[in-house]
Swiss-Prot record:
Gene Ontology CC terms: chromatin; nucleus
Lineage: Eukaryota, Metazoa, Chordata, Craniata, Vertebrata
One Gene Ontology molecular-function label: RNA polymerase II cis-regulatory region sequence-specific DNA binding
Residue ranges with Basic and acidic residues bias: 10-21
Expression sites by tissue: Expressed in developing neurons. Transiently expressed in the cerebellum during postnatal development, exclusively in the premigratory zone of the external granule layer where postmitotic neurons undergo initial stages of neuronal differentiation. Expression is not detected in mature neurons. Expressed in the anterior lobe of the adult pituitary.
Purpose of the protein: Transcription factor which binds the E box motif 5'-CA[TC][AG]TG-3'. Involved in regulating energy expenditure, body mass, voluntary physical activity, mating behavior and reproductive longevity, acting through the hypothalamic-pituitary-gonadal axis. Acts as a transcriptional activator of target genes, including Ndn, Pcsk1, Mc4r. Is also a transcriptional activator of KISS1. May act centrally to regulate function of both white and brown adipose tissue.
Name under which the protein is recorded: Helix-loop-helix protein 2
Biased composition (Basic residues): 68-81
Listed SMART domains: HLH
Recorded phenotype for the gene knockout or disruption: Disruption of the hypothalamic-pituitary axis in both genders, but female pubertal development is influenced by the presence or absence of male mice. Altered female sexual behavior and reproductive longevity, with fewer pregnancies over a shorter period, abnormal estrous cycles and reduced ovulation with aging. Reduction in neuroendocrine gonadotropin releasing hormone-1 (GnRH-1) cell number and altered location of these cells, and morphological and functional abnormalities of the adenohypophysis. Ndn expression almost abolished at the level of the optic chiasma in the hypothalamus.
Name of the coding gene: Nhlh2
bHLH domain residues: 77-129
Length: 135
């Protein structure tokens, strides 16, 4: 499932939200913008005749902070780094579930459990152990 830049902002790694563009892609890195980047801005002379390319597209310094963030996130380098961070996060998450699974008694012992089953079984087992300690 693809996320829009607005949805992705909520799920990004916290350290990536305060980085400047040069640290992620460099000043000369090519970036992809959104469709709104292609809309012409008002021309300085206002005569409506075909102006220069600079008059049709906003200068990077004229972009809002949010638009700069969207462009930075569109770089291949940023996407690759984000994918790497996400892969590491998911691997750590799965490893934690595997460790929790090893601590839970099941029959048969090698039965494959889903993550929700592991959590529910852990809740029941902890409740049981609390009850045993209280008696």
């Amino acid at each position: 499932m693809m996320l829009s830049p607005d949805q992705a902002a909520d799920s990004d790694h916290p350290s990536s939200t305060h980085s400047d563009p040069e640290s992620l892609g460099g000043a000369d890195t090519k970036v992809l913008g959104s469709v709104s980047d292609l809309e012409p801005v008002e021309e300085a002379d206002g005569d409506g005749k075909g102006g220069s390319r600079a008059a049709l597209y906003p200068h990077p310094q004229q972009l809002s902070r949010e638009e700069k963030r969207r462009r930075r996130r569109a770089t291949a380098k940023y996407r690759s780094a984000h994918a790497t961070r996400e892969r590491i996060r998911v691997e750590a998450f799965n490893l934690a579930f595997a460790e929790l699974r090893k601590l839970l008694p099941t029959l048969p012992p090698d039965k494959k459990l889903s993550k929700i089953e592991i959590l529910r079984l852990a809740i029941c087992y902890i409740s049981y152990l609390n009850h045993v300690l209280d008696v």
